[in-house]
Amino acid sequence: MQLCTKAYCLFVNEEAEQNEWLLALVKNKKGQYHSKVAFQEFFDVKARNYFAKPYGEKFKPNTVTIAQGFHGKVEWQGNYSLNLEGDFGPDFRQIVSWRNNIPIFSGQAIDLWLEYKKSEDVHIVLVATQFQQGTLDAFQQRWEFNDEELKNVCVLDNQMGDGPVFFSLLAKGKGSLSIISLHDRHSRRGLGTFLPGGDRYVTSDREEIFCYFDPGDCKPPLNVYFSGYKTMEGFEGYNLMRNMGGPFLLVSESRMEGGNFYMGSEEYETMLKNAILKYIHELGFTEEDVIFSGLSMGTYGALYYGCDIRPHAIVLGKPLASIGDVAANERIHRPGGFPTSLDVLNYVTGGIRPEHVETLNKRFWDKFDATDWNHTKFIISYMIEDDYDMTAYNTLISHLSSDGVQVYGKGIHGRHNDNTGAIVGWFSGQYEKLLLDDFHRVVEKPQKD
């Protein structure tokens, strides 16, 4: 039961005989007790929300169409946002629409989250219009969400037939409106974001952080994995971390095109740090009972928040540290390879000039150099000809001046994305060795069918 049951998916009859084994299982799996009557309700109503494959995406700013009647100022901030300024009129009227529709099936629910910023005198309404399947204009139903409702996740709960949904935004008033991203995710109707039990945190600027915590067997270490760059929203590394056998925490974000390297406002970064500490303390662990890890963009999160937590070890694959350099390399060394880096540079520093590159690099290295790493191991696999952050490994080594710090590294020939398989293979092998040597954990290989 411990191995085959997933967290948040264990349901026990409240009349079952209580013993030490069952109590431990319910605790470790975040299980729930139900009466016989509640079980019937669960099967009738809630079971459908435990579907296997989560899904989330966002509409990019370049899929937005501006209404012909708007004559104000229009500005595109890369792939980050569309900024409008002017007089939207005294009454609500359509200001923008999104060119791509999304499907929604009968009985399905979709969570919507609109990232935006606006002047106080500007008011908006998000409109979702569903058409009948197989038709171009046969109206089926319509949802509207005003300013107050948009403060929370909005849900399209479809109790009618299948059909595509078209989105538009109405506005009135005078001032500025920045449309950043419209996110749509398959909803579990309050039972978790992306995965059952998935936690969502949001700042006053509407920026999100996602965490999925599995207590495992509640024995050290807690394995924390930061998701890398991805355009499909959700968590990364679930099977990898679950196969380690112990408690694990997945961290993810959905800003920019595929992530913002976990950097943000003071509120954002404090929220993420406190979320990690909350799960550590829930287990009764200390920072020395924690391992941070990540691949590519996820390595920055592991290093950046590693400065705050100072875990027992940090396991990295394809490390990225000088994000200013990553953006600068887009011009000559990697043209068109990772344009999101330019959006990140502009978002964090307010520009894309050489001085902004240096400012972004300094943001990381000042924090890294101020940290005492004397109790932390670094296990790093890197690409020798990396075209994102060419000097990440060597620069990390040169900045690790704390007494007692241990570094294990392996270089693999190729550019950043040339041999991810070899990187992941060494990453997981060293992770398993770390668990065995330092925590006496043996990772059992999953059975093959």
Please identify what each model-predicted range represents.
Residues R334-K410, H416-T420, V424-P446:
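The feature captures the conserved acid-bearing segment of alpha/beta-hydrolase catalytic domains
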Residues G294-G306:
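Glycine-rich nucleophile elbow surrounding the catalytic serine of serine-hydrolase chemistry
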Residues K219-G228:
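Short beta-strand element of the alpha/beta-hydrolase
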Residues Y262-F285:
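Alpha/beta-hydrolase active-site loop
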Residues G245-G258:
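Conserved alpha/beta-hydrolase
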Residues G284-S296:
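Alpha/beta-hydrolase fold nucleophile elbow
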Residues K53-L195:
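Beta-strand-enriched, solvent-exposed domains that form extended recognition/catalytic surfaces
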